[in-house]
């Protein structure tokens, strides 16, 4: 029986040629990940890696009424009956690590991660049961300009990777004073419309009132649009804090829109919440989001510590880049040696190792196909340079390298070819 992938997961590999699955090409993922490392380094963030699975209670602080905890977690018992869960989101494990490793001894902790997440989600476009997320978490400082800096990093990443038509949507949920005031107003409003709400929103009315604003159910939309906006009820301190964030974004020319219905899907958010929205082919959708979560660390058993961060789904980022037409796979290797005859094998083996030591990515074609066929394969596999080696090259000590991209070639001694290859690789944008 043929083995096959489970539903909701996929392979990332370098030999994809059809447009539909091009987003799974290894080189595209490498390019996005390289941008992440570079941009996060510019802002002083360091990479953190947490285990694929955690004790299940780590994720209960995400919110027992959230969709993740209620129906999307991959939870299992180990051989000793302990409940463990595959990581469904990035923030809770980093909070656990922060507490476990006593990182509160530092005033300011800035992390980023690129990690797989696991959620048992309904099959739909852009949603996968294993997906990959880039996120940042800044723990220890509460300041409106720190929040603006997080948004600037988000915007910088989108610009650097090449995404177009981006906008950030913002809302401010406020602190304890604001939330208590607004909860009372919102409860009275939804109580008047309770009979018309969806079953899910009726459930949220008793468990997590604010999440009704996040409902996607058709029967809720008109009621939600008429709901009183939270920004009408924020305290003076909250309004001042939010205004300072907006002024900072204006100073950086970051495009934003205030969305008074935005609440996010996880229960731990306080104060600032945001989503990054793109428009592609007349369709708008979120590519990531986040906000401030000043109460999560204390509720997880750590010291009261402010924090802010975001998460971005990389599958949608790469798919959107391809849809916007400015993203193509990179060549998978720079130079391919083709020993035309078996007596050239040893030469190619030794020279390839020397070329690699010089920093020239090199592959050897050991299939001994006819040269015409070997060149076709090299072209199909996006080799940038090809160098056939046979008896003539060994005797004359003159080598010819074909530039497959430019359809040009150059010749010379081994040392001359090495210098030309180094120059070409350093000065060619692929």
Curated annotation (Swiss-Prot):
It is found in: Cytoplasm. Its EC number is 6.1.1.21. It catalyses: tRNA(His) + L-histidine + ATP = L-histidyl-tRNA(His) + AMP + diphosphate + H(+). SUPFAM superfamilies: Class II aaRS ABD-related (SSF52954), Class II aaRS and biotin synthetases (SSF55681). InterPro entries: aa-tRNA-synth_II (IPR006195), aa-tRNA-synth_II/BPL/LPL (IPR045864), Anticodon-bd (IPR004154), Anticodon-bd_dom_sf (IPR036621), His-tRNA-ligase (IPR015807), HisRS-like_core (IPR041715), HisRS/HisZ (IPR004516). Its main location: cytoplasm. Keywords: Aminoacyl-tRNA synthetase, ATP-binding, Cytoplasm, Ligase, Nucleotide-binding, Protein biosynthesis. GO terms for biological process: histidyl-tRNA aminoacylation. The keyword Zinc-finger does not apply. One of its GO terms (molecular function) is histidine-tRNA ligase activity. It holds the Pfam family tRNA-synt_His. GO terms for cellular component: cytoplasm. Belongs to the class-II aminoacyl-tRNA synthetase family. Homodimer. This is Histidine--tRNA ligase. The gene is hisS.
């Amino acid at each position: 029986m043929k083995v096959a992938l489970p539903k909701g997961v996929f392979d990332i590999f370098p030999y994809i040629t059809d447009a539909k699955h091009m987003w799974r090409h290894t080189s595209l993922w490498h390019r996005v990940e390289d941008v992440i490392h570079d941009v996060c380094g510019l802002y002083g963030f360091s990479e953190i890696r947490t285990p694929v699975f955690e004790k299940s209670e780590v994720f209960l602080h995400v919110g027992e009424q959230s969709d993740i905890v209620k129906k999307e977690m991959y939870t299992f018992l180990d051989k000793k009956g302990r409940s463990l869960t595959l990581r469904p989101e990035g923030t809770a494990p980093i909070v656990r690590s922060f507490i476990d490793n006593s990182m509160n001894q530092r005033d300011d902790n800035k992390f980023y991660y690129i990690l797989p997440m696991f959620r048992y989600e309904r099959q739909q476009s852009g949603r996968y049961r294993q997906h990959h997320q880039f996120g940042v978490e800044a723990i220890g400082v509460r300041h409106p300009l720190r929040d603006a800096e997080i948004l600037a990093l988000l915007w910088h990443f989108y610009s650097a990777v090449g995404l177009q038509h981006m906008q950030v949507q913002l809302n401010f949920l406020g602190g304890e004073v604001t939330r208590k005031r607004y909860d009372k107003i919102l409860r009275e409003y939804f109580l008047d419309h309770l009979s018309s709400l969806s079953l899910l929103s009726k459930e949220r009315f008793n468990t997590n009132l604010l999440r009704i604003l996040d409902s996607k159910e058709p029967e809720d939309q008109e009621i939600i649009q008429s709901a009183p906006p939270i920004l009408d009820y924020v305290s003076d301190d909250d309004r001042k804090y939010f205004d300072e964030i907006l002024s900072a974004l204006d100073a950086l020319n970051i495009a934003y829109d205030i969305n008074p219905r935005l609440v996010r899907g996880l229960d731990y958010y306080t104060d600032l919440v945001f989503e990054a929205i793109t428009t592609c082919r007349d369709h708008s959708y979120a590519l990531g989001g986040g906000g401030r979560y000043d109460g999560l660390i204390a509720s997880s058993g750590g010291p009261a510590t402010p924090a802010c961060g975001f998460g971005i789904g990389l599958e949608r980022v790469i798919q959107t880049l391809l849809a916007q037409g400015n993203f193509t796979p990179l060549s998978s290797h720079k130079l391919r040696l083709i020993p035309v005859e078996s007596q050239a094998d040893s030469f190619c083996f030794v020279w390839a190792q020397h070329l690699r030591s010089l920093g020239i990515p090199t592959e050897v074609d050991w299939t001994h196909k006819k040269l015409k066929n070997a060149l076709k394969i090299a072209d199909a596999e996006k080799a940038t340079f090809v160098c056939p080696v046979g008896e003539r090259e060994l005797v004359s000590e003159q080598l010819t390298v074909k530039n497959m991209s430019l359809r040009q070639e150059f010749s010379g001694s081994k040392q001359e070819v090495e210098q030309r290859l180094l120059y070409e690789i350093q000065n060619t944008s692929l």
